[in-house]
């Protein structure tokens, strides 16, 4: 009997086959003979204490992966799974947290989850970098207008971002004398919302670096995302340009710094974001970059990932 792999994922027709890391994982699983079932968050439920769902049983015809017929529907208890990937993109809101509770229940039934639900809750992608004060730029996490204004006054130019977002959404660069400062703070803070402020790093003009880490070990190549001329954000969805380069000694040093935490939280797949020599985020929910690196270099990252999963 084939083993079943589940994947909690965004709508399949919203994914780009040539770029999407989740699809790369699905294809690798299929090539290894796994049955792969895709689940949308709204179709997962807990009934009488049993995590269950309706999903889409994906077929081996990879070209038709995005257009699935109703005949491929799957329904049942999630305890039938051997492995579950969580690949739902943020925002990391209460609905996301509820999904991690489902994952907890599954793990109690012996189903392995990547990454584990408890770790997704405990390792907030932005907040968690505060555990490495010597490896990050000057950083403030606060909901206080007073404290944030003091931080802006001290560092003159800062980056402001919510703790629960992704893809460069709602990220602002603000100067000490910016006439829109109050409006930006009102927009971000809302009703005492906690945000992150970081000293602006001019190295972002040369690009930020996404380092993929599998079970604590970095991949030898990293994705450099160079912002467009009219945008400071190093996000491909915001127009940044991709460049694949070899990982350097400084990046390896940063990976070694966070490695014990990765192992402690059983984080099989992580995306580390670096600007200059500073960590800016530790992505654990749905790291991307596989397709860009694989298309440029002779490396099969999903094979490395599944080899590690199957041997650990």
What are these regions (language model features)?
Residues 30, 107, 152-153, 189, ...:
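Anion (oxyanion) recognition and catalysis
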Residues 9-18, 34, 226-231, 237-238, ...:
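Charge-biased, low-complexity intrinsically disordered regions
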Residues 146, 153-157, 167-254:
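Phosphate-binding site of ATP-dependent enzymes
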Residues 11, 88-91, 163-165, 287:
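Short glycine-rich anion-binding loops that position phosphate/pyrophosphate groups of nucleotides
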Residues 134-156:
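Rossmann-like NAD(P)H-binding beta-loop-alpha module
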Residues 13-141:
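Conserved N-proximal alpha/beta basic substrate-recognition cap immediately N-terminal to
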Residues 3, 15-18, 246-312:
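ATP-dependent carboxylate activation and anion-phosphoryl transfer catalytic cores
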Residues 7, 85-86, 198:
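Redox-cofactor binding/interface segments in oxidoreductases and associated redox assembly factors
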């Amino acid at each position: 009997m084939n083993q079943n792999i589940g994947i909690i994922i965004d709508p399949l027709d919203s994914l780009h086959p040539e770029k999407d890391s989740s699809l790369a994982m699905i294809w690798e699983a299929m090539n290894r003979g796994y049955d792969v079932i895709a689940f949308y968050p709204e179709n997962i439920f807990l009934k009488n204490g049993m995590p269950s769902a309706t999903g889409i049983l994906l077929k081996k015809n990879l070209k038709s992966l995005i257009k699935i017929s109703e005949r491929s529907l799957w329904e049942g208890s999630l305890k039938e799974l051997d492995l579950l990937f969580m690949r739902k993109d943020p925002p990391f809101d209460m609905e996301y947290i509820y999904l991690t509770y489902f994952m907890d229940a599954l793990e109690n039934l012996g189903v392995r989850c990547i990454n584990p639900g408890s770790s997704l809750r405990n390792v907030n992608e932005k907040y968690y970098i505060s555990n490495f004060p010597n490896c990050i730029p000057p950083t403030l996490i606060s909901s206080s207008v007073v404290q944030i204004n003091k931080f802006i006054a001290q560092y003159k130019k800062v980056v402001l971002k919510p703790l629960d977002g992704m893809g460069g959404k709602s990220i602002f660069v603000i100067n000490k004398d910016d006439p829109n400062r109050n409006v930006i703070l009102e927009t971000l803070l809302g009703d005492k919302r906690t945000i992150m402020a970081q000293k602006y790093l001019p190295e972002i003009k040369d690009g930020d670096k996404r380092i993929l880490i599998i079970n604590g070990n970095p991949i030898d190549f990293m994705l450099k995302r160079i912002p467009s001329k009219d945008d400071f954000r190093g996000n491909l969805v915001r127009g940044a340009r991709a460049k694949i380069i070899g990982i350097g000694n400084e990046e390896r040093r940063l990976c070694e710094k966070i490695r014990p935490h990765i192992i402690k939280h059983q984080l099989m797949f992580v995306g580390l974001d670096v600007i200059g020599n500073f960590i800016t985020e530790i992505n654990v929910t749905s790291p991307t970059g596989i397709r860009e690196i694989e298309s440029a270099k002779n490396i099969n990252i999903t094979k490395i990932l599944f080899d590690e999963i199957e041997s650990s």
